Amino acid sequence: MNQLEKEILVFKTDLETPERLDAIKPFLDQHPGIIKWNVDNHDIDNVLRIESRNMAPADIIELAKDAGISCEELPD
C-alpha cells in the first residue's frame, strides 16, 4: 500500500450503547494510524468504519479487544 493511500476497514461490533462507545473512543482517537472513524448504530451489526493508513484489520480487532469490545471484520 502506498504510504499516502487510505484504506476503509469495516467491522461488526457490539458498540450498542454510549458506554460501549466511550470504552473504545480513546483507543481509536489516539491511534496514529487512524484518520477517522464512525459507528452506524442504526445497522444491526453496529458497523464500525475506520479510515486508516497502514493498518491491518487484525490491528483494529486487537485495539477493540483491549477496550473490551467485540469486533470482527466484515467481508467486502
Regions of interest found by a model, annotated:
Residues 38-44:
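RNA-recognition motif
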Residues 2-15:
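Short glycine-/aliphatic-rich beta-strand segments at the starts of folded cytosolic domains
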